[in-house]
């Protein structure tokens, strides 16, 4: 039986029973107060965790003009990875397969053809080797594949198998193709593998986790070495976060006794950057101008872990600790009511001309694409494994393992 109108009405009354102590106007006022009085800098228990770079400011520009500005970089490459999602087989194996790809703008068929595949395998069978196998090449050397066996890292093994596959594929692909990038490389997502911090429920620090597991060590080392590689070459490396989910800023504000009527950091910044004008009896959103913040140096949450001292991450690094710190700004697009985050290693952000170039490129791309920059969108499309491909790959794995998927009713009904 589907929902009838009477059901919709009944459900809607539930929302009316929930108290709303803060209306949208009050939320904007609270956000404005936090912006004006709490972020220059914002202090945590061990010092400043968020600091403006060259002053705190909000910037705006007409969307049409930003979209038509000249290109800042002659070429831009993007990199992303996608998976078939964790799948359990009747032989006891939990498997995920990730594909990483790099985009080039302007397009390059050779770059787009290149692929890196990582298959992560977990088993409760203690006799299964928890290590990394050698790389296998195919497609005349354009494809590389590797099987890795994960160990018991966290309570949610599916999350670990999935995360390791994505991170290993993306980071290996980026490192293996780093030398073809001449002007700018953009990761589809944060600069660092921040989900690994969420696996610390059984471990005191990331360094403890790294010391216990070679795969986590490889992931963390790859992303830190990627920064080093691009700093050494003098080519900027950027992380473009399409859907920021962090709550580290909100938690810190709450710990300082400040009101936080927002679910995420992105919701706070969206209220700070949204501009409204009076139209008759209502306030309407200004939709023809992008708004964005200044750059901030961040030690919030996972940012502080990866930008911290060597003993905190468990990996030796070739640059000063401060070079790895995350420096970011956020862009608000009023056409879609979406917020995007742009991350840059401090080693690059120290130079004003680099910050300005990245800022101009990012806002221009968001204005022109009405969403993520074209190199990011292309990398996402290249790396994505669609539903039909997932089904075929799963069938191939069943034949290879000589077993069936350990299915359930949800998978049968919903195809998940």
Predicted features along the sequence, with ranges:
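Compact, glycine/acidic-enriched structural inserts
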Residues: 11, 18-20, 105-157
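Long, contiguous domain-sized segments
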Residues: 2-11, 15-17, 36-48, 56-58, ...
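Adenosine ribonucleotide-centric catalytic and binding domains
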Residues: 74, 78-125
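Short linear interaction motifs
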Residues: 53-79, 155-159, 163-169
